[in-house]
Amino acid sequence: MFTTVQPTNRSSLPDDLFTAIKELKRELNAVILAHYYQNSDIQDIADYIGDSLGLSQQAARTPADVIVFAGVHFMAETAKILNPDKLVLLPDLDAGCSLADSCHPEDFARFKAQYPDHIVISYINCSAEIKAMSDIICTSSNAVKIVNQIPAHQPIIFAPDRNLGRYVSQQTGRDLVLWQGSCIVHETFSERKIIELKVAHPEAKIIAHPECEASVLRHADYIGSTTALLNYSLKSSEKTFIVATEPGIIHQMQKSAPEKLFIPAPALNNCACNECPYMRLNTLEKLYLCMRDKTPEITISEDLRVKALLPIQRMLEMS
């Protein structure tokens, strides 16, 4: 669960937020973890930038006393599950996740009860309550690897992302029972507009996140997690890429390979719908305020934390 108190006293912000945040980080012995989908200025001040797997691994081993999570609430909650004695802060408590919200604990409990012989592998983009009902957690980086380690005779429920589940099923040859959840960002990409971009840039490689719909993935030259997409684009000899995931990742791509062209995949409508509205709620100002005021703090009951911890630990062991 989350506190409901937002940072107060937003006046008198320092002129140099970067310097002020660095000073607070030293005072608090804090680490700033940021997802690739965060605004570029937050990425630039973070101690570690990564995908869900990398951020979980960093959270599990950080010596810092305070974890400032520039991401969405299930990520900060995961950090708290792994670090019950540390102060975990989230700049904006409204930074939720459409995918996590698509899987309500009561509904999932009824769904799970229909398949008593199945184990549950849940994508990390879910609440602590869903994690507690799971046997193993996975990320887009390791989902295929984890499913491949499950004995062939063992049936599997995969939740909550149907698109990632479908992709994992295709890659592993396993029949998975899928929860029908999805990410609003990765389902907004337009197949037609991506094809039009490819026609305009025939030399471009299409790279896509497996949360995208099958209609988009079938055009992709490479499919992978955000970290995998970044690494592929940097190692490839190609110079132009159409990027079908949240465009925040392009900041790191451009920093690492300024000579290359990265084109964000367009949405169905003429809007900024390919940007995650929840990730973008975090700002440099809110990052400073949450560190200054030490709130909003992420809290979770010990009983729920212990239940949610085990499947996360299994993931880290199997990765």
UniProtKB/Swiss-Prot annotation:
UniProt entry tagged with the keyword Plastid: no
Cofactor note: Binds 1 [4Fe-4S] cluster per subunit.
GO cellular component, one term: cytosol
Places the protein is found: Cytoplasm
Catalytically driven reaction(s): iminosuccinate + dihydroxyacetone phosphate = quinolinate + phosphate + 2 H2O + H(+)
E.C. designation(s): 2.5.1.72
Residues the record lists as binding iminosuccinate: 35, 52, 123-125, 140, 209-211, 226
Binding site residues for [4Fe-4S] cluster: 97, 183, 276
Domain of life: Bacteria
Keyword Metal-binding: yes
Enzyme class, spelled out: transferase
Pathway: Cofactor biosynthesis; NAD(+) biosynthesis; quinolinate from iminoaspartate: step 1/1
Cofactor: [4Fe-4S] cluster
Key words, A-Z: 4Fe-4S, Cytoplasm, Iron, Iron-sulfur, Metal-binding, Pyridine nucleotide biosynthesis, Transferase
One Gene Ontology term of the molecular function aspect: 4 iron, 4 sulfur cluster binding
GO process annotations (BP): 'de novo' NAD biosynthetic process from L-aspartate
NCBIfam families from the UniProt entry: nadA (TIGR00550), PRK09375.1-2 (NF006878), PRK09375.1-4 (NF006879)
Function (record text): Catalyzes the condensation of iminoaspartate with dihydroxyacetone phosphate to form quinolinate.
PANTHER family in the record: QUINOLINATE SYNTHASE, CHLOROPLASTIC (PTHR30573:SF0), QUINOLINATE SYNTHETASE A (PTHR30573)
Protein family according to the UniProt entry: Belongs to the quinolinate synthase family. Type 2 subfamily.
Name of the protein in its database record: Quinolinate synthase
